[in-house]
């Protein structure tokens, strides 16, 4: 199993982003995960039952204002995960991701996004590690077919609501959370 994790965040309106900050975020969050997956493939392909786990974010459920580029980069990770899970099946490689909400890591230091203020930082690194473990050690056939994995009950509830709701309802809920 390879844990493919790369992420930085910039905050504020896109039009106010410092020169180079968007390029840096995309180089890390998008290119880092993509190139990490590509580099891991030959090793995974030689390992029966291999798995690639990408670290995404609950920000991939609906675009988040004030952290729009970060959110978009995590949408990319979710899409890459889905595509590679299909593409690499022929090589017996399962590809999944984990979507935590705000977790108690250095990534959130100094972040003032409304979604962070409204939801708080309740997820611990240990909870994320447990979600990673559970994602790569599925206990049922249903769980083995699952691609996206939440961490907390709230992550999972938000994902389910987004999956079952029309876009307008999901957008209203995202606005309520993120302002």
Protein language model annotation of sequence segments:
Residues 57:
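Residue(s) in the substrate-gating loop at a strand-loop-helix junction
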Residues 5-10:
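Conserved NAD(P)H cofactor-binding loop of Rossmann-fold oxidoreductase domains
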Residues 97, 117-156:
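C-terminal helical subdomain
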Residues 15, 64-68:
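Active-site loop immediately N-terminal to the catalytic Tyr-X3-Lys motif
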Residues 62, 83-94:
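Active-site-adjacent segment of SDR/Rossmann-fold oxidoreductases
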Residues 37, 73:
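Active-site helix of classical SDR
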Residues 13-14, 18-26:
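Substrate-binding pocket helix/loop in short-chain dehydrogenase/reductase
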